[in-house]
């Protein structure tokens, strides 16, 4: 079965920011409103996915604005410092827009950045001050926007070790742990049902690799 879901992107981050600005400027239009509501629903489904999520930010990635929400929804994120040996693409960047600060709340009612910097207004303000800037790996790691930043010497090995490590665990047994980490802070009726109850009833208490005779939680 599937244990880990890896997110990658490819494109022009400046173009993504331009689309974000367009949607914001036209947010009262029915089509722009529907697009944003659809993205809101899709991102919530990512939040509630019962598998380990990892984002890989490499040269050529376009994790900016709305697409950067995918990085913030993941359990871990890895960003390459500089370029791959022999590569000719510019170094990876992450960029923020207003879309990261309100339009796409999680099931618990706060943004993914508010969840990441829970009750840490200073860090959240520092991140907000960088809206519109193309942040390289060192800057993103320093701000706390990614889990790890590695150069090309360690890159392949670190990604491989993480994927092998995560796949060696019971993906269903990890669901509760990951739900607790993803949904810190306030509880809403939505998060109580879909982030808590569903995780335990539909995955942990039902799945053979979690609670079966040889399941991870019965060893």
Language model segments and positions:
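C-terminal alpha-helix plus adjacent terminal tail
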Residues: 1-54, 58-70, 77-86, 128-142, ...
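Helix-capping/helix-break motifs at membrane-protein junctions
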Residues: 118, 151-152
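CoA-thioester-processing core
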Residues: 64-127
